[in-house]
A protein has these predicted regions:
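A short, Lys/Arg-rich alpha-helix, primarily the initiator
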Residues: 2-29
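Short basic helix-loop element that most often maps to the first helix and adjoining turn
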Residues: 21-37, 97-104
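Short alpha-helical DNA-recognition segment
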Residues: 31-49
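Residues that mark the N-terminal boundary/hinge immediately upstream of a DNA-recognition element
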Residues: 33, 59-62
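DNA major-groove recognition helix of helix-turn-helix/homeodomain DNA-binding modules
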Residues: 61-79
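Short, charged recognition helix plus adjacent turn
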Residues: 77-104
Length: 104
């Protein structure tokens, strides 16, 4: 069974790379080793290295787990949709809501 590869835009790759750099800097500022963070996050060292490189094939749960270990920074993920710049970029996109059929 082959996994489907999701196409990632170059801008997204750049953002993920920057996020990875910030995660690595946060780990180094806290003087935490790769082993400590990976173990606390419940991921392998290889996955942590991929997170720090901004690899787009890493599950978002791994990013969230690492951010949680680095002083609960994962709560920042909740505020992304409130960011004005982010909101202005998605303003034109129609969000699909599930419409339920009436039982009447």
């Amino acid at each position: 069974m082959n996994k489907r590869r999701v196409e990632v835009f170059p801008e997204t790759e750049t953002i993920l790379s920057q996020v990875g750099e910030q995660i690595k800097l946060a780990r180094l500022r806290r003087q935490l080793s790769v082993e400590e963070v990976a173990s606390s996050a419940g991921i392998s060292r290889t996955t942590l290295w991929a997170v720090e490189k901004g690899n787009s094939s890493v599950a978002i749960g791994a990013y969230a787990a690492v951010l949680r270990v680095l002083d609960k920074m994962d709560s920042d993920l909740l505020f992304m949709a409130k960011d004005e710049l982010f909101a202005s970029k998605i303003k034109g996109i129609q969000l699909n809501a599930r419409i339920r059929k009436s039982n009447k």
